[in-house]
Swiss-Prot record:
Subcellular location: Endoplasmic reticulum membrane
Alphabetized UniProt keyword annotations: Coiled coil, Endoplasmic reticulum, ER-Golgi transport, Membrane, Protein transport, Transmembrane, Transmembrane helix, Transport
GO MF annotations, alphabetized: SNAP receptor activity
Listed name of the protein: Vesicle transport protein USE1
Task of the protein: SNARE that may be involved in targeting and fusion of Golgi-derived retrograde transport vesicles with the ER.
Membrane topology: Single-pass type IV membrane protein
Length: 259
């Protein structure tokens, strides 16, 4: 099915946003955020459009738009470590937006931002070390006077920052795992309650069917009994009528003889 005009406009704007995200932008740049907001509106309109694409295509568009939103939110964070952590949770698109792309542009932007945030973390660490007071430098170097910190110490401190970053990731992963376990427990409990309710409902329906069968049997038996009673009454009335009729005939025949 041919792409609609709305989808073509969305693809053009998405390609433009990916190109802007890959470029180096000023902190005051506002166009990309506005474009991403327009992408969200166009995506919502495309989901309810009469000639909307397949669900897989819409999901791919959603991933890319969510990636751009998450990237903009990560850029607003103050710490480079927070930016790097937020960047790791972003999921780039899996399919190129245009035919000219060999690799999805969002994946390239993801790798670029990861490298940039890692470089910022290293720069922040080096800048903090170079601005420390003289007494603190003496304590870490063990010699008198202000001397530059060795590369070995810098590497150790960088490893420490990365280790803290990894610990934070592990903590978040443990919390997510705990939430998943809690959700699984609640789901199993809900399933158990639903299963018991279904069993109770099935038992009630079975009892209702049994009672209906009993009621039907009793109704048939009562109907037969009623029919038998009516038959006996009818026969009794016929016998009485016959007896009266015969008696009248005999009475009529006997009466003249008596006269």
């Amino acid at each position: 099915m041919a792409a609609s005009r709305l989808e073509l406009n969305l693809v053009r704007l998405l390609s433009r946003c990916e190109a802007m995200a890959a470029e180096k932008r000023d902190p005051d740049e506002w166009r990309l955020e506005k474009y991403v907001g327009a992408l969200e509106d166009m995506l919502q309109a495309l989901k309810v459009h009469a000639s909307k694409p397949a669900s897989e295509v819409i999901n791919e568009y959603s991933w890319k738009v969510d990636f751009l939103k998450g990237m903009l939110q990560a850029e607003k964070l103050t710490s480079s470590s927070e930016k790097a952590l937020a960047n790791q949770f972003l999921a780039p698109g899996r399919v190129p937006t245009t035919a000219r792309e060999r690799v999805p542009a969002t994946k390239t932007v993801h790798l670029q931002s990861r490298a940039r945030y890692t470089s910022e973390m290293r720069s922040e660490l080096l800048g903090t070390d170079s601005a420390e007071p003289e007494m603190d430098v003496r304590k870490r170097t063990g010699v008198a006077g202000s001397q530059p910190v060795s590369e070995k110490q810098l590497a150790a401190e960088l490893d420490l920052v990365l280790q803290r970053h990894q610990n934070l990731q592990e903590k978040l992963a443990e919390e997510m795992l705990g939430l998943a376990r809690s959700l699984k427990t609640n789901t199993l409990a809900a399933q158990s309650v639903i299963k018991k309710d279904n069993q109770t409902l099935s038992h009630s329906l079975k009892m209702a069917d049994q009672n209906l069968e009993k009621l039907k049997t009793e109704s048939e038996r009562l109907e037969q009994h009623t029919q038998k009673s009516v038959n006996w009454l009818l026969w009794a009335m016929l016998i009485i009528v016959c007896f009266i009729f015969i008696s009248m005939i005999l009475f009529i025949r006997i009466m003249p003889k008596l006269k």
